[in-house]
């Protein structure tokens, strides 16, 4: 079988970009390796951000970070995003084929990038990796320890919010990318289905301390947003919703064939 790397080399006249989407802990790296795509150029802001945190002597265990560490993390993320943007622009200017490894939490930013890539002469595909909320939170919670401190764990509240946004975007991405949309599922066999129990188990133990007090108006808006998020997430945890999501997905073998066809087109 012709390798995907060979296909890319033969199609240098028309660069290809694969935008990777999925919540933290969805197993995007695992899926990439299973699809024989690991040899392609991969752009991931974490490859810049994590070394910056290490150089600044800031913990990668972001779920347990102090207020001072959270402040430094935000500073380093801003710097990493600036450098990452330059790397993406240079790759596009060089007409290199690549994989953009992100979450896809922002539909508007992703749609804008797709348009910019197409205007630059790229053919663009999305590879979307769906996972359930509990797996996303579990993988994130264990990542720092399992990597022996070499990989970062995010604040679980951020993971849950990102999961909600990227899951909500699935049908919109399917419509945006059309035939160039591929989705695979990577889920737990048994999962919790009650949002309050999930919050109690995965979020409450890591609730940030030392945060700046909110004004009554700010607290009201925050409470309303959290209530709305919980209601939406509870719907997303239902069997009916998950069955609808799975309808968009395909086997890894079919995904492999679709990607090969895309790269060879």
Regions found by a protein language model. Name each.
Residues 2-11, 239:
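Proteolytic processing junctions in secreted/extracellular precursors
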Residues 11-15, 90-93:
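Phosphate-binding P-loop
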Residues 17-19:
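Short hydrophobic/aromatic beta-strand immediately N-terminal to the Walker A/P-loop
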Residues 23-24:
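The conserved Walker
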Residues 27:
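Conserved glycine(s) of the Walker
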Residues 30-96, 108:
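Conserved substrate/cofactor phosphate-moiety recognition/catalytic segment
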Residues 118-140:
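Conserved phosphate-donor/acceptor-positioning beta-strand/loop module used by diverse small-molecule
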Residues 134-265:
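Conserved GTP-binding G-domain of TRAFAC-class P-loop NTPases and closely related GTPase folds
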């Amino acid at each position: 079988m012709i390798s995907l790397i060979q296909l890319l080399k033969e199609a240098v006249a028309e660069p290809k970009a694969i935008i990777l989407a999925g919540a933290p802990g969805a197993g995007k790296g695992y899926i990439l390796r299973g699809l024989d795509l690991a040899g392609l150029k991969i752009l991931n802001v974490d490859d810049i951000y994590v070394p910056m945190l290490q150089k600044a002597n800031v913990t990668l265990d972001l779920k347990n970070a102090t207020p001072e560490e959270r402040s430094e993390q935000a500073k380093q993320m801003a710097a990493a995003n600036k450098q990452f943007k330059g790397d993406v622009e240079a790759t596009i200017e060089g007409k290199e084929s690549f994989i953009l490894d992100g979450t896809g939490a922002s539909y508007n930013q992703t749609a804008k990038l797709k348009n910019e890539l197409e205007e630059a002469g790229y053919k663009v595909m999305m590879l979307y990796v769906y996972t359930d909320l509990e797996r996303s939170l579990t993988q994130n919670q264990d990542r720092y320890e399992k990597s022996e401190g070499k990989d970062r764990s995010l604040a679980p509240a951020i993971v849950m919010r990102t999961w909600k946004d990227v899951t909500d975007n699935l049908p919109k991405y399917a419509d945006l990318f059309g035939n160039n949309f591929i989705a695979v599922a990577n889920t737990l066999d048994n999962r919790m289905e009650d949002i309050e129990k999930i919050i109690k188990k995965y979020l409450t133990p890591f609730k940030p301390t030392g945060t700046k007090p909110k004004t009554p108006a700010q607290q009201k808006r925050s409470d309303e947003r959290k209530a709305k998020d919980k209601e939406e997430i509870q719907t997303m945890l239902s069997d009916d919703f998950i069955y609808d999501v799975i309808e968009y997905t395909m086997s890894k073998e079919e995904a492999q064939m679709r990607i090969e066809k895309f790269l060879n087109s």
